[in-house]
């Protein structure tokens, strides 16, 4: 029996992280969905199984609230002459008092991403590409885990998909997936899992089984 793939669902507040999880788990009662910022205040998890075998664990995380200040704080954590890599800086953050105070919500996100195989970075594609989102990606990249951007709300006439694609490419994130959690495409789960399999080749067997199970249920 293989170990389940562990994914952290991360991103800014109100981008549709919980709605995406409701779609993937087919559980309308998962989490709390609201237009209020920071609706999710703690990490919530769900497990997807096929024939009694757990294949995927998904963790909904709080929205990142102040990545700009957090990135400045991470830079200040390095002592003179030090060259810490991303995970080392994150470990120092989690050991700090700020991780239990000012950056408590961000620390929850970092802690879960470090404990995961990869992260789904959910983006409200209607939003302009702002500096705070670039800083969020810089913080998340410091965890050293593969990130798959998920462009949400792409069915909206106000989407800025091309702007986001260009911005993500400049950050080295060329693999992404379109997945509107309000009006999910019929093949949305397949495309999401196939994109993940490109980033996590060792998890392909679990992801292929999830795809096959979803298509069997859809055809029933």
Each model region followed by its residue ranges:
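Conserved C-terminal guanine-recognition region of P-loop GTPase G domains, centered on the G4
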Residues: 79-176
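Non-catalytic alpha-helical scaffolds
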Residues: 1-17, 118, 142, 198-220
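Canonical P-loop GTPase G-domain recognition
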Residues: 153-219
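Conserved G1/Walker A P-loop phosphate-binding module
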Residues: 1-90
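Non-catalytic alpha-helical coupling and interface elements of nucleotide-dependent molecular machines
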Residues: 15, 63, 67, 142-145, ...
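Amphipathic alpha-helical transducer elements in NTP-driven molecular machines
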Residues: 40-43, 103-106, 189
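Short, conserved acidic/polar surface loops in the N-terminal third of protein domains
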Residues: 68-72, 132, 160, 188-190
């Amino acid at each position: 029996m293989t170990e389940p793939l562990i994914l952290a669902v991360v991103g800014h507040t109100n981008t549709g992280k919980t709605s995406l999880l409701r779609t993937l788990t087919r559980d309308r009662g998962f989490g709390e969905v609201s237009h209020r910022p920071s609706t999710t205040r703690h990490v919530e998890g769900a497990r997807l199984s096929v024939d009694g075998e757990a294949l995927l664990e998904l963790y909904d995380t709080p929205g990142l609230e102040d990545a700009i200040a957090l990135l400045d704080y991470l830079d200040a954590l390095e002592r003179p002459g030090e060259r810490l890599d991303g995970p080392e800086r994150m470990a120092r953050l989690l050991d700090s008092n700020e991780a239990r105070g000012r950056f408590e919500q961000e620390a929850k996100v970092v802690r879960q991403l470090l404990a995961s195989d990869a992260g789904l970075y959910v983006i409200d594609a209607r939003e302009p590409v702002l500096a705070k989102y670039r800083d969020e990606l810089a913080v998340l990249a410091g965890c050293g885990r593969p990130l798959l951007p998920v462009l949400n709300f792409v069915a909206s006439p106000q989407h800025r998909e091309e702007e986001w694609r260009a911005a993500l490419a400049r950050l080295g994130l060329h693999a992404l997936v379109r997945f509107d959690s309000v009006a999910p495409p019929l093949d949305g789960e397949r495309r999401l899992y196939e994109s993940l399999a490109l980033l996590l080749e060792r998890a392909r067997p679990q992801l292929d089984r999830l795809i096959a199970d979803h298509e069997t249920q859809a055809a029933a």
